[in-house]
Amino acid sequence: MLTRRLSCLALLMALASPAMAADAPTYGEKLEGFDYGWPVKHFTFTSQNQPLDMAYLDVKPEKPNGRTVVLMHGKNFCAGTWDGTIRALSASGYRVIAPDQIGFCKSTKPEHYQYTFQQLADNTHALLKTLGVDRVTVIGHSTGGMLATRYALMWPQQVEQLVMVNPIGLEDWKARGVPHITVDQWYQRELKVSADGVRQYEKNTYYAGEWKPEYERWVTMLAGLNNGPGKARVAWNSALLYDMIYTQPVAYEFNELKMPVLLMIGTKDNTAIGKDLAPPEIRKTLGNYAVLGKETAKRIPHATLIEFNDMGHAPQMQDPARFHEALLKGLQAR
């Protein structure tokens, strides 16, 4: 029944927005039509009594250095948005595995799924086991930083190094005063995603007020996915994921991380889930990464903090050369 309602809603939205359909490309429910520039592989498995398909990239270097890196993308990102990082790591001898998590991008978006960071971590662990990969360095960006933290806490013996790039979840938004909204309310918000809205948000948050032509590709990807034929299902899974992010903080467990941790922070980032819902006096205190990065580094036993004082939420995309130089040095210094 939900599938029928979502499909009908997607059709009505498409019919009501002919200008949008004519002006911008749209992509399928599993991001069909958008090319990552790398061969996409698929891991099929059963979870929560249903068959699922996890898309992933597995890029092997020409001159291996013996290390494997797992890249965990953020909420508004995909495996493909790691393109520059994949190239930098591969050129330095790292094997790179970059999944699209369930609910995202080129992977299955279930009608019903109990999303937890533990479940997503377990899905990723199953993928690595199938690939015969044991010891890994895990790099997580944004929401992927929360997932990478959970993964490292669940399998500390497997994670030789953890890297977090502007992770969200450095503060507990509920405890800070961000009000809860229901999944249905998140869903209604996600149905309104547009290219203009994505572009403005990314400019202000990801790139610290800057804009370059190469950023437009990722606006097209996200807006095209959210306004394609799978619009309703994409929005529904996005709503479920936002509820997961809001209700499952990892900030209280950073002190339990046993491995070396590299924390890479663009200090002009201002990301905070649901910040616009908070009262003005609270809103202005949220997402202060110039403070959050330093506070978090103090809570992690073996942390190294690298700050980029002129960058926002996505330093690996804002200034790839400078970011990757710092990343590669940090990986070697573990």
Where are these regions (language model features)?
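Flexible "cap/lid" loop of the alpha/beta hydrolase fold
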Residues: 149, 153, 162-193
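Glycine-rich "HGGG/HGxG" loop immediately N-terminal to the catalytic nucleophile
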Residues: 80, 101-117, 173
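Conserved alpha/beta-hydrolase catalytic His-Asp/Glu region
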Residues: 193-255
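N-terminal cap/lid segment of alpha/beta-hydrolase-fold proteins
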Residues: 29-61
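Conserved acidic catalytic loop of the alpha/beta-hydrolase fold
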Residues: 118-136
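Conserved HGGG/HGGXW glycine-rich cap/lid loop of the alpha/beta-hydrolase fold
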Residues: 48, 52, 57-106, 326
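Conserved serine/cysteine hydrolase catalytic core
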Residues: 227-298
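Catalytic active-site module of serine/aspartate enzymes centered on a nucleophile-bearing elbow/loop
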Residues: 290-334
